[in-house]
Each structure stands twice: as structure tokens, then as C-alpha cells.
Amino acid sequence: MAFLPKFDAGGLVTCVTTDAATGDVLMVAHMNDEALRRTVATGEAWYFSRSRNALWRKGESSGQTQRVIEMRTDCDQDAVWLRVEQTGAACHTGRRSCFYRRVERTEADGGARLVFVDADRLFDPDAVYRK
């Protein structure tokens, strides 16, 4: 059976990336055809930045790399899941995961608030991404 990803109108598929050792969700990003091909060919995670309209290899600026242990696709082949060996932080904020805030319901008004969890920074993003 062939891997034939179904890209959206922008030429992208959603990618969920988890830590292969812990199962923790590290990040959600997007991949275009080139990012998928490079990920398969190199065993390193490559993504497509919608904000920069550019291909990028995880860790090329920060040194916080992802070695792919396994890649899966969903039933429609319009999303992929990477299980990776994460070196350092996955989030551009310097945190291990991009999911460092829990959403909790507020009793008083039935709204929601954010609570920081696992929010320690592993690196200073201002120092790493300084231009």
C-alpha cells in the first residue's frame, strides 16, 4: 500500500509530534510535500512554517533536534504523527512542549483560564533566536 498524503488547499498536512519515550505531545505543526520527503529521507523532522512560508528542519536555529523513531498517517492520509527522540526543547518558547498551559474552567463565571504546567524553560529564546 502506498503512502499518498492528501494535502489541503494550501498544500499542507497537519503533523502531531510526540516524545517516543513518554508519549507526551510536543507540538503540532504542518508539513508540505518537501518536508515529508526530507523527513522520510533523513530521519530528522522537517516542517513547513505558514508564517514564514518556508521549509525548516527542527533544530536548525536552536539545536533542539528531533530524530524520527516512527511516522504514522491517519485513515484519510491527511495528517501525520511523528514519534521522535527530542533533544532539548520542542517549543520555540524554550519549553519542552508547546502544550505547557492547561485550560481550566473558572467556577465563578463558567469561563476558562490558563494555568502554567511544565513551563520551565530549557533555553532562552531571546538568546537563541536573536537576529
From Swiss-Prot:
Keywords: Amino-acid biosynthesis, Cytoplasm, Histidine biosynthesis, Hydrolase, Magnesium, Metal-binding, Zinc. Its cofactor is Mg(2+); Zn(2+). Pathway: Amino-acid biosynthesis; L-histidine biosynthesis; L-histidine from 5-phospho-alpha-D-ribose 1-diphosphate: step 3/9. Its main location: cytoplasm. InterPro entries: PRA-CH, PRib_AMP_CycHydrolase_dom, PRib_AMP_CycHydrolase_sf. It is found in: Cytoplasm. GO terms for cellular component: cytoplasm. Binds 1 Mg(2+) ion per subunit. Mg(2+) binds at residues 74, 76, 78. Zn(2+) binds at residues 75, 91, 98. One of its GO terms (biological process) is L-histidine biosynthetic process. One of its GO terms (molecular function) is zinc ion binding. It is an enzyme of class 3 (hydrolase). Its EC number is 3.5.4.19. Signal peptide: none annotated. It catalyses: 1-(5-phospho-beta-D-ribosyl)-5'-AMP + H2O = 1-(5-phospho-beta-D-ribosyl)-5-[(5-phospho-beta-D-ribosylamino)methylideneamino]imidazole-4-carboxamide. Belongs to the PRA-CH family. Catalyzes the hydrolysis of the adenine ring of phosphoribosyl-AMP. Homodimer. This is Phosphoribosyl-AMP cyclohydrolase. It comes from Bradyrhizobium sp. (strain BTAi1 / ATCC BAA-1182). The lineage of its organism: Bacteria, Pseudomonadati, Pseudomonadota, Alphaproteobacteria, Hyphomicrobiales.
